Swiss-Prot record:
Binds together with bS18 to 16S ribosomal RNA. SUPFAM superfamilies: Ribosomal protein S6 (SSF54995). This is Small ribosomal subunit protein bS6. Disulfide bonds: none annotated. Gene3D superfamilies: 3.30.70.60. The keyword Translocase does not apply. It comes from the Bacteria. Keywords: Ribonucleoprotein, Ribosomal protein, RNA-binding, rRNA-binding. One of its GO terms (biological process) is translation. InterPro entries: Ribosomal_bS6 (IPR000529), Ribosomal_bS6_sf (IPR035980), Ribosomal_S6_plastid/chlpt (IPR020814), Transl_elong_EF1B/ribsomal_bS6 (IPR014717). One of its GO terms (molecular function) is small ribosomal subunit rRNA binding. Belongs to the bacterial ribosomal protein bS6 family.
Length: 152
């Protein structure tokens, strides 16, 4: 009986130890690329999001290096990728997510980047409003302080 394996689209987010060297980071993704290609898969994109603060600490670590990748592979490749990432001490967390097969990876990445840009714009807007509130509060406090000094 012949089994056919079909490539399915996936994305993965990997959190690496903040002290991981550039060489260790490259080695991990070279191994991942080799694993995917050995199962006749292909990598669509790999992005480094850099060192970011974690929402909740992992052990005593408050920061991690984030990576995001999209690729096509079969389920056996995913099992092997997860096995190798569990072994690697520098990988703190990872999550593979199977994407909708009806959407091409290119379209997915366009939508993903658009969502990131919108999220960043909302965050900037929130920060600007917070800064304006802080400035208004400081001005009101200074005014009250002046009136108090004058004895009003």
């Amino acid at each position: 009986m012949e089994t056919t394996t079909t490539k399915k689209p996936y994305e993965v987010v990997v959190l690496m130890h903040p002290d991981a060297s550039l060489e260790e980071q490259k080695d991990l993704f070279k191994k991942n690329k080799a694993t995917i290609e050995s199962y006749k898969g292909s990598i669509n994109s790999l992005e480094t999001w850099g060192k970011r603060t974690l929402a909740t600490p992992i052990g005593k670590l408050k920061k991690a290096i984030y990576f995001h990748s999209t690729f096509e592979a079969d389920t056996q490749a995913i099992a092997e990728l997860e096995r190798t990432m569990r072994i690697n001490d520098k990988v703190l967390r990872f999550m593979h997510t199977r994407l909708d097969e009806r959407t091409s990876l290119g379209k997915f990445m366009e939508g993903f980047k658009k969502g990131l840009a919108e999220s960043a714009a909302r965050e900037k807007e929130r920060e600007a409003k917070a800064a304006a509130r802080k400035a208004a509060f400081a001005a009101a406090k200074a005014e009250r302080s002046e009136r108090y000094d004058k004895g009003e």
